[in-house]
């Protein structure tokens, strides 16, 4: 059992941060206090103001204790908000570390300064003029960066009207996502360790990994746990995405993570599930996901495919040519029909939300004709009138999809 952290009620009414076992259920914490209520919706989106559940701060504390963090270490949270991670200083073994906090949310920093007087605080943009001296950190001091940096895709269609794509960021760390830019900033600061929360998609989606490659190529993943974004206050209950609490250790240049290694990596969730990307086949490896120039007869159109969470929000077969229309090769129609059925019938765990659509390739012939019949019945505006669904099709398809998810 981890050591009990102190209760801090100054400025946050009735917030209890209790010690928890590494596998214990969540406790009442900062998310129940609505502590970002001073921010508008746009402010919460742009600042990434979704604060960290206490049990993950506890987990990071355990990792740092095991590393032997001491007075020669600087523990910095450069997007600290109200300072949830500075409860680390109440751990006896970590009390001697030097603590630095920073956030551009001046209201949050003002309150954090009252709650954690032993921490040196700044209100600077951590993504501009990135260097240790900006925060008074010596070049030779061992640095561990902790926290829950903002992760908002400034190009996303979701909340598009409230996101600010013009936040100042150094050119050499600029990406389409502030969280990715934050990781690149930590690499630029040459942090010895990085213990932060970020979307699992940074690791598992190849485009995201490549955008953040300068960080990952210099760090190895030494500990982690995955949980649902639904644990954050103010987030959607409809489509939780996987968040990883990760401990990275700086290694020799070019000796860090590769995406091929990530695909083989065995990930663990807070609920005790384990999975790897290479543990699944993906139907999207057999079909076109994005618009292309090929044309077929008959013309069948499908909406652009991304991950499973995006599939839940988007259409599948469409009757009109739009910029997001994918022309379907008739020979591969069963695969597209399977995606349509997967959207309709799959009940996937949150940790699969950023996956491509999985299937079992060697067993697909069992349902090939069934998914075509089912998709035709449910998309008659595209395929024409179908009198009845094929008997038993839905049950067989559901059973197959359940088998895929348990695979």
Can you say where each PLM-predicted feature lies in the sequence?
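Class I S-adenosyl-L-methionine
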Residues: 1-115, 125, 130, 371, ...
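Short catalytic/ligand-binding loop motif for oxyanion handling, primarily in non-cytosolic enzymes
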Residues: 86, 152-156, 202-207, 255-256
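Short amphipathic alpha-helix with an adjacent loop that forms part of the alpha/beta core around
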Residues: 128-141
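Internal, well-ordered alpha/beta segment that forms a basic, Gly-enriched binding/recognition surface
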Residues: 144-156, 185-186, 194-195
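Mobile active-site "lid"/loop adjacent to the S-adenosyl-L-methionine
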Residues: 152-175
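Conserved Class I SAM-dependent methyltransferase catalytic core
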Residues: 173-232, 246
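Flexible, glycine-/basic-rich loop-and-beta segments that form/coincide
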Residues: 239-297
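C-terminal target-recognition/interaction regions appended to catalytic cores
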Residues: 299-407
